[in-house]
Swiss-Prot record:
Coiled-coil features, chain-numbered ranges: none
Subcellular location: Nucleus
GO molecular function: protein-lysine N-methyltransferase activity
Limits of the SET domain: 38-265
Protein name per its UniProtKB record: N-lysine methyltransferase setd6
Family: Belongs to the class V-like SAM-binding methyltransferase superfamily. Histone-lysine methyltransferase family. SETD6 subfamily.
GO terms under biological process: negative regulation of NF-kappaB transcription factor activity; peptidyl-lysine monomethylation; regulation of inflammatory response
InterPro entries per record: N-lys_methylase_SETD6, Rubisco_LSMT_subst-bd, Rubisco_LSMT_subst-bd_sf, SET_dom, SET_dom_sf, SETD3_SETD6_MTase, SETD6_SET
Amino acid sequence: MGPDAKKQKLQSEDHLQNDLPVSCFLAWCKKVGLELNPKVYISTEGTVSQYGMLAREDLSDGELLFSIPRSAILSQNTTRIRDLIEKEQDSLQSCSGWVPLLISLLYEATDSSSHWAPYFGLWPELDPPDMPMFWSEEEQTKLLQGTGILEAVHKDLKNIEKEYNSIVLPFIRRNPEKFCPMKHTLDLYKRLVAFVMAYSFQEPQEEDEEEDIEKDILPPMMVPVADLLNHVAQHNAHLEFTPECLRMITTKSVCAGQELFNTYGQMANWQLLHMYGFAEPHPQNCNETADIQMVTVREAAFQVARTEEDRLEMQKRWDFLCHIEIVGEEGAFVFGLEEVMTEEELKACLKVLCMSTDEFAEYKENDGWEEDEDNDEQTLLTQEISRLPIPWRKLLHLSAELTLKAYKTELSMDEALVNDPTAYAKLSSREQHSLQVQYGQKKILHLLLELTKS
């Protein structure tokens, strides 16, 4: 980065530090013992999205960016209504497991006297990231068809409304001294769900606790400052958890003027857009994936079947695969750039759908158990798909073709836009992010077509 660019960044830093919400937040950080390295600063300029953190000076690998005492974290255990939440914990059980935190946010975010008021002051209107759940239905369909995001958003909205009406609203009505249905509305709840989805952290399980993971799942929590760092797959910072505090540490050297990036995990672009409202430009996301819905493979098998009797046989095999929980109506086979993430399920499905009648009878008699000739521990690399048995490849090829038909545009059209800076710049941010999602998915699906062609 040249000196002019660095000077511009430092000027934007000075401008932001004079911004009232940010200056109030930074003052609060000092008050609660949140220690920020003087070599970094918070900004909305020069970042990939909204707030971010940039380096004022060069940083070395392993350098502490900031530390956050656990008392500054906002969770169901630190909110002022923690006793009430604990008292009503049985009635706050939900599939998401987020209700206690969301109720804490409903209370703290709407009270100007809250300990975390300066933190919420960074988002004066509590406006969430520009996630697809807040787009119009027309825009959702236009930009997201075929990506899997559309179905995920519809499921989210249905679950949010159900959770609010069946759990949260009754809680609000039982506690009128602290809550009000006119103030703590479904719309506000939806926005706070987006905040939790985009900004919350979940403490990882200790290794010796893995066996009890279903029993002792730790609830999400809001971590000031840490949630301001943006994400890229090739990140340069990492959040560490200690008994006393949380610490953000650099994982590589960072030059002055560069942005600090945390990681949200190994996330494909469709997941990033769905949960965080952005996507990484191709080819920067090394975690990109494409899904083929399991029911699409079933549809391909039906199309391959020559007679009605063959189709009935395929249905029997599909039903059996569902019975032994290899496939499901809402499941998907996931293909990455380097490997197949659902190798075991994919191989079992293709094998059963393509085996002879006698082989299936024996397989069914053994309830799906058989002596594996393959090494179960060996990962199926994407490039190795070309070595699968011919009938398997034909079925997978047709499944990829059917998946591609669900999109509104062809890969060539997406490629032309991505490679034309002028045309790409004219797109809205929503259009750009959606394009990156579709382009990455279609590239992988076309790779599958190439690897499975006869």
